[in-house]
Regions:
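Bacterial N-terminal signal peptides
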Residues: 8-20
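N-terminal leader/linker segments that initiate helical-solenoid repeat arrays
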Residues: 23-67
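Hydrophobic face of amphipathic alpha-helices that form TPR/SEL1-like repeat modules
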Residues: 35, 67-74, 78, 103-110, ...
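Short helix-capping/linker turns of helical repeat alpha-solenoids
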Residues: 58-61, 74-76, 81, 94-98, ...
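Terminal, low-structured helical/coil segments at or just beyond the last alpha-helical repeat
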Residues: 176-214
């Protein structure tokens, strides 16, 4: 099972709630106040947070829909609510939010709240992967799609495609150890000619998406 929390969460944890959502700062839950051990990085949002976020989500804001889905899935309002998480991930993903698309792909891959389907997982990972830049769900989608190609799940096993998506998931850096390790795993299965082919596909992809990168 792959982590579904969007990378933008780390910004939330470091600098506070997203300004665009105008959420209140997370409140320490009663269990924490009572001295019960709890993950200090796990956000806890108030009812006011939920009300504000839900209002924005209902008005069609894709980012708010994604955050609402994450909150329901992770239990940030108290108890996890997978059906509502799935509902809002689908709405946000349909609007093109890459974090939601990647998370929806992972729900299909893991069979969380839905019938497991590697085919649908690949579909949503691919949608996330096509976004530029590669931060957050786009980069995660590329890595996850690469893993499906590496393992032959939902798509034919294809080391060239796996290598290509792993390379793209790294963006302009190699400082993502798990993704770099995945790239190495694919390369070990390939001939030099196949690696050259994959590198060529990476450059072709970048050219096709050049306008989005500017």
């Amino acid at each position: 099972m792959r982590a579904r929390i969007p990378l933008s969460l780390f910004a939330f944890l470091l600098v506070g709630p997203l300004a665009s959502l105008t959420l209140c700062a997370p409140q320490a839950p009663t269990s924490m106040q009572a001295g019960v051990k709890r993950d200090p990085l796990e956000p806890q949002w108030s009812e006011d947070d939920r009300t504000q976020l839900l209002a924005k989500a209902k008005h069609g804001d894709a980012e708010s829909q994604m955050w609402l889905a994450s909150a329901y899935e992770q239990g940030w309002f108290g108890k996890a609510n997978i059906p509502d998480a799935l509902k809002w991930y689908k709405k946000s993903a349909a609007k093109g939010n890459p974090d939601a698309q990647n998370s929806l792909g992972q729900m299909y891959e893991d069979g969380v709240g839905v019938k497991q389907s590697y085919v649908l997982a690949a579909k949503w990972y691919r949608k996330a992967a096509e976004h530029v830049p590669d931060f957050g769900g786009a980069g995660q989608g590329r890595n996850n799609l690469g893993l499906l190609y590496l393992e032959g799940r939902g798509v034919p096993r294809d080391y060239v495609q796996a290598y290509m998506w792993f390379r793209l998931s790294l963006g302009n850096t190699s400082k993502w150890p798990p993704r770099a390790s995945n790239l190495s795993s694919a390369a070990q299965q390939m001939t030099m000619a196949e690696i050259d082919e994959a590198e060529h596909k990476v450059e072709e992809w970048k050219i096709r998406h050049h306008d989005q990168q500017d």
